[in-house]
Amino acid sequence: MVAPAVRLLAALAPVALLVAAPPLTGCGGAAAPDAHVCAGAGVCGAGYCVAGRCRPADALPSPIDARRVLLPPADLAVLAEHGGDGVPDAVALGREGGGDVVLLLRFAPDFGAGAEIASAFVVLEPTPGAPPAERAVPLEVARILEPWHSNTATWGRQPRLSLPEAAAVVRRRPATPLRIDVTPLVRDWARRRKDDHGIAILAPGSDAVGAAYSMGISQGVGPLLEVYVR
């Protein structure tokens, strides 16, 4: 059975939600193709660490001429190496006791003909009061290449993915919304690629505590797709 909250998310999926995490500020376009993953200030030379990527000062990810759209997932699944079935209220990404975790997200965006995707991010809200990870937690992102459904997806029955790429590093503190840059994947959706079935976020179980994020099942805000559209 799909949890009631997941069914509600599916019903809301076509509707833009202007709530939750505050918008990014800045101007320019998305990250350069060779922009590397970062976790904080002081690691990007002359550039800035914004939304998990090193970016030059003139290429920040929220253009002033773009509109911001927030979409909940049409479907989501949390696949934990040592976890149970179903979507929990919160998931601790990177927690060693839970093993590796794969978060599957499918969205139903409709940006209109001719829309230009300036930048796009998956936004995860931290679980209030959860302890911080003991160390930085690396995350990867991949394109989901075949159909899947939360009713049937399990750790042993995962959809096929593209080659994962480094996407973000979760900092120990402060506990702020995490933005994962998925701009190339969302641009592919706009081109109607037939082998696009959502986004997978992968976290290795390598920390004693992990970084806890809300799935929005009974409280808090679950994952959102934040897109800046021209």
Predicted segment positions?
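Sec-dependent bacterial lipoprotein signal peptides
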Residues: 1-26
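Bacterial signal peptide processing site
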Residues: 28-30
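Disulfide-braced loops of extracellular cysteine-rich modules
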Residues: 34-48
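Flexible, small-residue-rich N-terminal segments that precede or flank a structured functional core
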Residues: 53-110, 149, 205-209, 216-222, ...
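Solvent-exposed, acidic/flexible segments
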Residues: 96-101, 113-118, 134, 192
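A short beta-strand element within beta-rich, extracytoplasmic domains
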Residues: 107, 116-130, 225
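Beta-strand-rich interaction/scaffold domains
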Residues: 128-195, 218
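Ser/Thr/Pro-rich, low-complexity mucin-like regions
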Residues: 190-210
